Amino acid sequence: MIRDIQNIDDDIVRKKRVIGEMLYNDPDIIEVLDNPELDPNCPEEYYYQNIYPFIRIPGTQDTSRNYITFMLDDMEPSQFNKAMKSQFLKVVIFVHKDLVKTKWGAERHDLLAYLVRDVFHLSNSLGLQLNLKSNREGVTDTDYCTRTLQFEMVTPNSMQPYKTNKYERDSIVNNHDRRVNRESV
């Protein structure tokens, strides 16, 4: 591979790493996720067990679990300023029906939503301020209730005047026969 995959210059990849770290480094979130199989003193273990950097809908399983899943989307550039774009962080919390009740007097999906909102709403941790746009309750099936939070931020748009695709940039096109020389790739 000729691309430097270890140093990806992509704001979504970078921000998703930060979002995941912010979630699993919050001890209250780890406690409320309530996974007795994992050590709360090693919160990074919760990543890809209870916290996912993509929307993962739980399937049929033997053990009841709770999940925080998230995705980050680029939306259209600002119509007034092409150097800026809107990004949306969507957090979907799934709580198994057997784990909804908590010792804190709030339903687990509502409590997790409160904690997530507390971490991200009006936070500048991803560069520019995140603003909560919606907080909705729902269900997936007979086993899981959900809470979906959507945050918006306006952030700089990529304004790179050159291509970063090394396969395309390093290729040589011979105009006579339109063959692509990829020997340097």
Regions found by a protein language model. Give the residues of each.
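Short, charged interaction patches at domain edges and termini
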Residues: 1-21, 77-84, 126-185
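Functionally constrained cores in energy, signaling, and assembly domains
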Residues: 14-16, 27, 49, 74, ...
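Acidic, Ser/Thr- and Gly-enriched intrinsically disordered low-complexity segments
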Residues: 29-45, 56-71, 78-81, 86-129
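Small/polar-rich, solvent-exposed N-terminal microdomains that initiate assembly or binding
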Residues: 1-79, 175-185
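Intrinsically disordered, low-complexity segments enriched in small/polar residues
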Residues: 44-46, 50-52, 65, 92, ...
